Amino acid sequence: MDFEKEIKNLAKEKIRSSAGGMPSETEADGRREIKEVMKIFLDITGLGIGIYNQGLANGRLSIYELTEELLTLFLNLHGKRLGFCLVAEGKFVVFLDEEQNQMVVLGKKRQSFGAGENVLTKARQLIRITFEKSDEGYVFKDNTGSRLDPEEIVLHIIKWAISV
């Protein structure tokens, strides 16, 4: 058996079987924009976590990019979804694409019920962000229409994640 050849054949077959469902140009543009926005927030969050962890003897924050398959299979979020998560001691924050030109940030925290029993709370929305492309890049706004700075958003999210 030629392992590499077999794997390549699997990939070719997958491409042939999924070629019929090509997205429209508008959908493709929307996907490109949300990918760019997620990358902006992923990079800023990664930078913030790196700076935070440098200040500690043992870094306690981590970040993970979430694949579409993970979001579908394990988190039961269907459709073409993008996201990443920030994991802190006792807290979990996930950044997800929402409707077109929107992303949502959800948080969960661990609750202790004594006797070593820990349960995560229901996810709560920390912020919903809308965005639009401009000549200078992207403009981010909250649900009231106020402009947002991505670094300030990430700073507040990290503060929430490390709070007791």
Per-range role (PLM):
Residues M1-S17:
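Acidic, low-complexity proline/glycine-rich segments
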Residues K5, R32, E151-E152:
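Generic alpha-helical secondary structure signal
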Residues K12-T67:
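Contiguous, amphipathic alpha-helical segments that mediate oligomerization or scaffolding
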